[in-house]
Amino acid sequence: MKKQYLYYPLFLGIFFGLGILIGNLLSVNGMDDAFTTSGNLKKRKLNRLIDIIDQRYVDEVNTDSIVDVTVNGILQNLDPHSIYISTDQAQAVADDMRGNFVGIGIRYFVNEDTISVLSTIKDGPSQKAGIKSGDRILTVDGRPLYGENKVSTDQLKGESGSRITLGVLKPGDSTVFKIPVTRGQIAIKSVDAAYMLTNELGYIKVNRFAESTTAEFNRAIDILKRKGAQQVAVDLRDNPGGVLQAALDMADEFLKDDQLMLFQKDRNNKRKNSYATSDGDFEDKPVFILINENSASASEVVAGALQDNDKGTIIGRRSFGKGLVQQEMQLGDGSAVRLTVARYYTPTGRSIQRPYDSGNEDYFNEYLERYENGELQDKSNIEVNDSLMYKTPAGKIVYGGGGIIPDVFVAGPKGYENQTLDYFARTGFADRVANDFLRTEGSYLRYMPEKEFVDSYQVPETLLLEFYQRARGGNNKSLRLTGNREFMMLLLKASLAEQLYGTELKVKLLNTMDPMIDRLKELSRDRKNT
């Protein structure tokens, strides 16, 4: 059975490439008979053209690259979410969807010309070998990784169980240590955090939807139940989506048996329904779903399924607006196409897919329009189409046509400075500054107990000033320290926490100064008292 994906994901030779792509697709799926005689002639003609270029053109031509460009051009003219996966990308994409890969288990960035370890995966090969955040990897089996044109992580990849020796430079040392590491299966975590926000309210942060997400999410639910959770909040902010079934499994945790969660329609208008089962652990308890403008596809499936069944409360800002379903099909040479094969609809019958008539660039940059029209600050600025109005079984008004509008609106960061700092919180900028600190004067933190770090560690002024100076680079000259000091300190401490103790602690710390989390707690208390 082919997997279906809901994923938030660019004209050279369009004419002849169309024939090649269609020919490959139909051949892969055993549908060559669908071609008319004329179609077969065109396909052979186009394939012949590629052969002639390959054999007779005056210069050497990489016809594989021509085909790749052509296929990309074709798919760009279909919809924003139909994509081509080249043979070079195929393994990484497969790993991402599956939720694991073979490697040494590190998060890293290239610092100047050297691989610097941000953190190690818990119980992974590198952690077991004694590698820590702040370490720099200089060699693999004696071959240098540093220097011009030398930095490539390909040498770190290999088969599971194979062994390599890393040359590692630790903070404060001048000796390069030779550390043997055995490659292994590394889980790509979907659940960043699962902990109790209050005595009653459990919290789960989910960053993606992969094949492994269901098992991770179920474990998180079990942890919270054992800790006494009577309510649960699922944070899907900035979650771009992924595997459809994982989203349906998540929604099933909160919906009763036989409740419609979603339906799909293909090109022939054939309908496929997805219903909840009786397996949910929180069917009779309050649930909250957190979304924002970057919550897409599978995240929207969950939010839409619950909202249309009058289950729980959706908190945040209007979601991205993707209602297309992709199916991955192999093209026979290791490459694949992830093609839109259906539209999905929430239980009330609404499509939340945004229009894409103006092209892919405008489609993916639509958030700029949301910013300019004030939607991110005021719910009343959200444009709705009354012809796309629907009612839930309880009579609540919901809209199709572009994302899930939350039940409870929480404004985004206001003003340039707050938006810049929010961007820093969601990207790796602060991580790099913190990692440099760990390699130098902060190396002692690598041995500090987590409780001591949480309870008593304060970010030094020198680190704050270094972050501030680097943050003001580029287009951020107007960024001020006054009024932002407390959040900058928290952001740096959270980045250090992730590199030292794991992502969950980073999430916990950032949540202490998060307006949406504050509003969530208010709603939780109100629900408890009713």
Model-flagged regions — what are they?
Residues 55-116, 161-165, 169-193, 510-521, ...:
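Extended, small/polar residue-biased N-terminal targeting/export presequences
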Residues 351-352, 356-530:
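Conserved functional hotspot residues or short segments at active or partner-binding sites
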Residues 298, 310, 317, 321-388:
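Polar, glycine-rich mid-to-C-terminal structural blocks
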Residues 29-42, 46, 50, 54, ...:
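Cleft-lining beta-strand/loop regions that shape enzyme active-site pockets
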Residues 1-5:
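Positively charged n-region of N-terminal signal peptides that target proteins for export
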Residues 8-24:
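Hydrophobic membrane-insertion alpha-helices, especially the h-region
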